[in-house]
Amino acid sequence: MQAIWLNNYPAGVSKTLDLDPAETLLDFFESSTTAWSDRPAFHNLGHTLSYADIDHLSQQFAAYLQDSLGLERGDRVAIMMPNLLQYPVALFGCLRAGMVVVNVNPLYTARELEHQLVDSGAKALIVYAGSAHVYAEIKHATAIEHVLVTEPGDLLPLVKRLLVNFVVRYVRKMIPKYAIGSAVPFRAILKARMSAYRRPEKLTGKDLAILQYTGGTTGLAKGAMLSNSNLLANVTQVNGWFGGRDVPGKEIIITALPLYHVYALTVNCLSYFEKGALNILITDPRDTKGLIKEMSRWPFTALTGVNTLFQSLVRHPDFAALDFSTLKVVSAGGMALQADTAREWQRVTGTQVIEGYGLSETSPVVSSNPLDLPEYNGSIGMPFPETNVSIRDENGVEVALGVAGELCVSGPQVMLGYWNKPEATAEVMTADGFFETGDLATMDEKGYLRIVGRKKDMIIVGGFNVYPDEVENVVTEHPDVLEAACIGVPDDDGDDDEVVKLFVVVREGSAVTPEQLRAWCKENMAAYKVPKKVEFRTELPKSNVGKVLRRELRDEQVAG
């Protein structure tokens, strides 16, 4: 498409970027730790590691992988832990050794973990003790040769370390029993000889850095191959877009999203690392009271999150008492931002949530609204610099402005392909080099994009296309509604047509009826889009980052 968005970029955002294809994440890390050596880098559980600490510990970790474990450049190393100080140490240690990081969700079941470890061919696993029992169930089915087990307090000072680990294991009983005979404590890395570290030679930007597995919404998760250049390009894009308000070396970002999720990995861990920022790592963001208490200790300047995180914060009675005077950047992604959430956030904090869009396959950020957005607009913003988009119909033909079609993306942040899946890669890459996202979108005359639904979630009612996102956005505007999701189900009249079924979570004390919700919909959308069936729920199925899982609702309907 013609890049009409370039003419509407906010002041200070360059239309082009100076990207060095030879630069690696190792170069990036070394320059950042040198520049910000004495600055605090990561804080968790009451303890802070400086950039110099991260430099030292990650080199020890790299040396341990190379010397003690005998791993080689290109070997895959899986990291399975929540936000702890050990995560950046392990991440950067692997990258400094020239190895490939496989990010693993610590909430995975044995089946999910087995698939990811087998598919990636990982040789080593660094696992949080609370998840070790899951690995123990499937250890003989994988190619894992080395296991390092970490407990929450492993990088804390002695007294605090012993106390935290004791409380987690014996008081809160958060560490189920497990049997992994060859497991090594994470703190073994502290005995590694620094002199044993060997900086990998001839690393290039094209080299694979991370296997970021997709959410598996359409079957088994696939490993998106993200190169050094992919990730560094996105870091440059993110900092070029949001950097105008930043003061290098002075920023404090609240990292409530898990670092194993590509959104937090690129934006919080990498982009803010380059700026010398302090990352406040939140181990359990579902503990809203604890999250707010931690936020109260810091003059935080930035926060990333998803809709459900922002909802839980603004609805908590303690949140409004926080000091928001230093808050400059609030970025949302991972799922659609609801209008009522955005407006309530602005009312309480005086800041605007800036919604963006991305995928695992794009490192992840593709687009964002400008920082000076005056109010919520329902858009995912404009494509980033050096990013091209094309909205195409089912025949691959580009559609006109305002017409819905599949969002296709090209740019330096687009993955190399899916790990060991050339056929799956070919299915999503077009002949002219675009990645087919599977999301349906429109573009307006200024270049702003709007997601109207997933291609596979689209509901066809009487020959008309109904996009779940649109219906859900209308329903969540109702004052009695907290959350909503809709899917297509067979009509009861026995023909092959679909109808819209709505699942709703209402506010406490609400007496709203299905008929009232349908009447609300009739006032705000065409008749064929109005849900024919309405079901009230106490909660909706969600992913670990709070994204509503429509596929589980569909599976329930099929199962009867």
Where are these regions (language model features)?
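Conserved AMP-binding/adenylate-forming core of the ANL superfamily
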Residues: 38-72, 78-84, 88-92, 109-114
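Conserved ATP/PPi-binding loop(s) of AMP-dependent carboxylate-activating enzymes
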Residues: 382-386, 397-428, 466
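ANL superfamily adenylate-forming
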Residues: 7, 136-205
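Gly/Ser/Thr-rich phosphate-binding loop
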Residues: 166, 277, 300-304, 314-375, ...
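Conserved adenylate-forming
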Residues: 68-72, 193-206, 211-255, 277
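Conserved AMP-binding/adenylation subdomain of ANL enzymes
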Residues: 232-252, 262-302, 316
